[in-house]
Each structure stands twice: as structure tokens, then as C-alpha cells.
Amino acid sequence: NAKIENAQGGFTGSGIGGGNGASGTVTIKDDSTVTATGGEAGAGIGGGYAGLGDVTIEGNTMVNATGGAGAAGIGSGVGSVNDAAGNGNKITIRSNETGTPTVNATGGKSGIDEETEEKIPGGAGIGSGAGDAKANITLEGKVTITATAGKDNVAIGDKNGEQVFTGLDGSITRYDSEGNDITLPTDPGY
């Protein structure tokens, strides 16, 4: 029964997970309440700047995650790439005998790279931050998810687009960075 009310990442670190240049492996399960915010370019939960996220959320949990600028709410930080084996982010959200996870994830805002002065898009709510890393997202059982995209990114997915889910119980609601509902017709509760 963990309760983490305000995990805040330092500069380029995730709220919970990896620091600058580091991937984060995080498991949140069974009667836990977590609120996490990434530092500049770090995921709320997952990888820091240039780091991937390997995140499992399971059972009766309440998770609120917000990415730092350009980073995912849950997933990777800015500038992350697939590992040597070609694997990107791995995110699993599922129900179990203790109950249903409720997840609110918001991608970080867009910004400007201070070194290159190039525009950086926002991060996905769940998935990949600004960068080339792919996201392997698995949702199982009954889930309640609200995901909001950062500017020029997706609510749930990676640079290849919104990930489609079928055959789930519960609800998935997706919003773009302007607050427009972009929930897919295949999402439960649509």
C-alpha cells in the first residue's frame, strides 16, 4: 500500500524512474496511489532524458503522471532511441484480483532545444517522448485511462501514431494538446 503524493524529477530526470541518460524500470501495483512529474525532458514515470521506460501498472492503483517538456507522461524522456536489440518503451497496464488501475497521463509540453534552438514536440501521454523510440504498450483486462498528448504528439503511442486497442473492458479517453477528444472508435467506453 504505497502512497506517493508528489514525486518530482530534477533537471532531465523522471519523476519516478531514470535520471539523465538513464532508462527506468518501475512497477506500481495493488492499492497504490502515485503522482509523479518529470523534470525538464524527463518522463513523469519511466526514463530520464534519452532514457526508455519499462513501466508496469497493475491492480487497484491510482496513477497521475505528467511528463517534463517534450517527455511522455508514462514512457520515455526526450531524445530516446530504441536499444541495441531494437526495443523501445515497454508499458503494461492491467487489472488483477485487487482491482482496476486508474491512470491519468499527460505528455510534456513542446519546447525549444537550448543547444540547437530547434523546436521539440511535446511527449505522448503514454508512450514515447520527442524522439525515435518506439512504444510497445499492452493494456489487459479492465482499465480506466485518460491520456493527453503534448503538442504534435499522440495520446497513447509513439511517432508512428495512436496505438489501437480492442477487446478491453473499462474506458480509454484520449485528448490532444488543445483538449479536443481524439478517442478512437475501438477504445472501450467510446
Predicted regions and their residues:
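Surface-exposed loop/turn motifs in large extracellular/passenger domains
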Residues: 1-9, 16-38, 47-67, 76-149, ...
